[in-house]
């Protein structure tokens, strides 16, 4: 007899199969909604464990960040190289209301722009928007040949690079400080800032492939439900009650 073995314990039946539970029965689906800044607001679906006890499904979803291709949000393949990050801020039934959380370029697009015989110029600024979002914005540009140029390359001097970087930083700061986060997002989609940088730097050195390649959210203000609803086109920042009409007081004769 082995030490510590209890003969009274009943043994399980040999060959008995273990009960298999489908993990998806404990989960539920939610629809992700993009802000009204984008043309296609239906981003997709996400999974989360069902609410049990003190654990709420909405608490697990708030703060979740999803990455979406801008081509899917705008319905155009011209934006296929840009990725948009959306953060879940509010849960309404089965819908998740999101806000802009950042932007980035795909790796293949960045590598395809880097070529020989040209100078790469990068600049970044940390700015606060008019609605108190602190963003770090990265811009990228490449030099190109001047008109009637004979030389094979289009290298810029250090003085040109410093001057161009200063102009880019000033334009980015001006555009961000005078815009809300939603307004800035609408400027990034058609690349309005890029055209402004190209016109401002053409007297210093001609540029090409100018892009705001990355936007990083560093700090956000206190959460405001009204502002989020206005961003999704589901209400204004102010909620006002309506006067009730057609109501008559009824007098109870007996209690």
Swiss-Prot record:
The modification N-acetylalanine is found at residue 2. It comes from the Eukaryota. It is found in: Cytoplasm. The modification Phosphothreonine is found at residues 245, 254. One of its GO terms (biological process) is cytoplasmic translation. This is Small ribosomal subunit protein eS1A. Component of the small ribosomal subunit (SSU). Mature yeast ribosomes consist of a small (40S) and a large (60S) subunit. The 40S small subunit contains 1 molecule of ribosomal RNA (18S rRNA) and 33 different proteins (encoded by 57 genes). The large 60S subunit contains 3 rRNA molecules (25S, 5.8S and 5S rRNA) and 46 different proteins (encoded by 81 genes). eS1 interacts directly with uS11 and eS26, which form part of the mRNA exit tunnel. Present with 92400 molecules/cell in log phase SD medium. Its main location: cytoplasm. HAMAP family: Ribosomal_eS1_euk. Residues 1-20 are annotated as: Disordered. Keywords: Acetylation, Cytoplasm, Isopeptide bond, Phosphoprotein, Ribonucleoprotein, Ribosomal protein, Ubl conjugation.
